[in-house]
């Protein structure tokens, strides 16, 4: 089953990258970061890594690229230089507001083969699996 979930995830991620890049100029990792910042404005990079499940290196590179394009601002603590607050700019929020419409439509099309009750069961099962990831990763998922 983990392989099957991975296959589905890879295909979704690859097609999302191509779609988001072509239509909005962002890759799927950038979209995940933008999306998380829309949900939790002002969070540090460590929180982004924790939520999207990526290592610090790829997240840092994507944050730098998004900052360079004017989609977010990164504030650092004056005493130690570490990042403590990342927020979307107005331009970043505008990209988010466009991409979220397309992302929700992609989700709707993907799940269209399931009845409403099946979608609810699927979401419940995926949440439970996510909460239990620590059983195989040794890490917290919160």
Language-model region placement:
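N-terminal leader segment of winged-helix/HTH proteins
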Residues: 1-24
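Residues within helix-turn-helix
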Residues: 45-46, 57, 64, 84
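Short, locally clustered residues in the helix-turn-helix/winged-helix DNA-binding domain
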Residues: 9, 35-39, 100, 127
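Charged, amphipathic alpha-helical coiled-coil/dimerization segments
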Residues: 19, 51, 64-127, 131
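Short capping segments at the starts of secondary-structure elements
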Residues: 40-44
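Short alpha-helical elements of helix-turn-helix
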Residues: 2-3, 26-35
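Pre-recognition alpha-helix immediately N-terminal to the DNA-recognition helix
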Residues: 15, 32-38, 94, 121
């Amino acid at each position: 089953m983990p392989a099957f979930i991975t296959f589905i995830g890879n295909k979704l991620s690859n097609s999302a990258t191509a779609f988001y890049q072509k239509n909005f100029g962002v890759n799927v990792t950038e979209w995940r970061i933008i999306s998380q910042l829309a949900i939790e404005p002002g969070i540090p990079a460590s929180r982004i890594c924790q939520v999207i499940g990526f290592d610090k290196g790829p997240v840092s590179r994507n944050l730098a690229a998004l900052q360079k394009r004017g989609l977010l601002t990164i504030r650092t603590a004056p005493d130690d230089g570490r990042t403590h607050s990342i927020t979307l700019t107005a331009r970043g929020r505008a990209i988010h507001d466009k991409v979220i419409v397309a992302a929700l439509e992609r989700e709707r099309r993907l799940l269209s083969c399931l009845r409403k009750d099946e979608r609810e069961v699927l979401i419940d099962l995926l949440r439970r699996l996510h909460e239990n990831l620590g059983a195989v990763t040794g890490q917290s998922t919160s």
